[in-house]
Design a protein with these regions (language model features):
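S-adenosylmethionine/decaboxylated-SAM
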Residues: 1-203
Length: 203
């Protein structure tokens, strides 16, 4: 299993290691000095650290290049500004394998921390995506124009303060067609992901 975890503090590696002992884990942190101290204190055993701002396109490209991308799970518990969350999702969603999951935590902060956010709140964007999933092509032109549903979203499930966006299985991959909003099956099924494949968490 390949996974990525976007964290603001290195306080949970032992938890992830105990929950996913065989996973390949990557954790991203904004504070480089924090990473150095964590490594020196032996807190990141079995964890591959990444450093930088998740809002910065160059940083995101560096993370993908260093980690190799192709994650089964991504958990964004990093920067809570809407611009940070959206920038990371826009670049990293394509790195989620078919059948994988992209978790976004603390979505409520996008409203409380940014009374006048740089862009619409991530919770509003996700609501538009859900609207398009629920009713297909019927009467969703407005929400699709504001925030088109990303390609290959199978479902979105939300709870208090967090949502998970699931990527469809390769065999049933659905693509959002630009412009018209029509959705279609892939002409040729992509290879299935084997259950025993290593899962990587990218945060």
């Amino acid at each position: 299993m390949r996974g990525a975890i976007l964290l603001t503090q290195f306080i949970l590696p032992p938890l992830w290691r105990s929950l996913l002992p065989k996973a390949e884990l990557w954790e991203a942190e904004f504070d480089g000095e924090c990473v150095k101290k964590a490594v020196a204190n032996g807190l990141l055993k079995g964890i591959n650290p990444l450093v930088g701002d998740q809002k910065d396109p160059a940083t995101l490209e560096e993370w993908v290049e260093k980690s190799g991308g192709n994650f089964d799970v991504i958990i964004d518990d990093g920067g809570h500004k809407n611009s940070q969350i959206k920038a990371a999702f826009d670049r990293l969603w394509i790195e989620v394998n078919y059948g994988g999951f992209y978790f976004i935590e603390d979505l409520q902060v996008g409203r409380s921390w940014e009374p006048k956010p740089e862009l619409e709140t991530m919770s509003q964007i996700i609501q538009d995506w859900i609207d398009q999933l629920l009713v297909g092509d019927w009467n969703v032109a407005e929400s699709r124009q504001r925030h088109p549903l990303p390609q290959d979203v199978a479902f979105i499930t939300c709870q208090l303060e967090a949502c998970v966006i699931a990527k469809t299985h390769a065999k049933f991959a659905i693509q959002a067609r630009p412009g018209g909003g029509k959705r279609q099956m892939h002409q040729a099924p992509l290879p299935l992901v084997e259950n025993e494949q290593v899962i990587q968490l990218l945060v």
